Design a protein with these regions (language model features):
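Short, well-ordered alpha-helices that flank and scaffold nucleotide-derived cofactor binding pockets
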Residues: 19, 23, 67, 94, ...
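Conserved active-site segments centered on acidic
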Residues: 2-39
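Short acidic/histidine-rich motifs immediately flanking catalytic phosphotransfer sites
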Residues: 46-52
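Ser/Thr/Gly-rich flexible loops in soluble cytosolic domains mediating phosphotransfer, phosphorylation
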Residues: 3, 75-104
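Short glycine-rich anion-binding loops that position phosphate/pyrophosphate groups of nucleotides
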Residues: 10, 57-59
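Short, surface-exposed alpha-helical segments at coil->helix boundaries
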Residues: 15-19, 59-66
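A short, gly/pro- and small-residue-rich
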Residues: 61-81
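Short acidic active-site motifs
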Residues: 38-42, 61
Length: 104
């Protein structure tokens, strides 16, 4: 199962994107767990996931969050702003899967 965490300022804004990513995974019969959290929950949640994607609101925290996740070999990367804004769940899912593949 692929475990993907989305992180934004409060954990609420990516909920539609999570749904679209799950739908895209179902179309391909991919087993996924995709959850969204606020950045305040990052430290407690990220070890459970294979990749963390950051929403545009918290992209400025990339360096700090990446450094926290690096010892566990968990990639942390920002979501493409256009894909986020247009809610392109399939593109974001593809990006997450490529990061997981590159890290493992």
């Amino acid at each position: 199962m692929y475990k993907i965490m989305l992180c934004c300022s409060a954990g609420m804004s990516p909920s539609l994107l999570v749904r679209k990513m799950v739908d895209a995974a179902k179309e391909r019969d991919l087993p996924v767990q995709i959850d969204a959290y606020g950045v305040a929950e990052f430290d407690m949640q990220f070890p459970q996931y294979q990749v963390v994607l950051l929403g545009p609101q918290v992209k400025y925290m990339l360096k700090m969050l990446s450094e926290k996740a690096a010892p566990l070999n968990i990639p942390v990367q920002p979501i493409d702003t256009m894909d986020y804004g247009m809610q392109r769940g399939d593109n974001v899912l593809n990006y997450a899967l490529s990061l997981i593949a590159a890290a493992h």
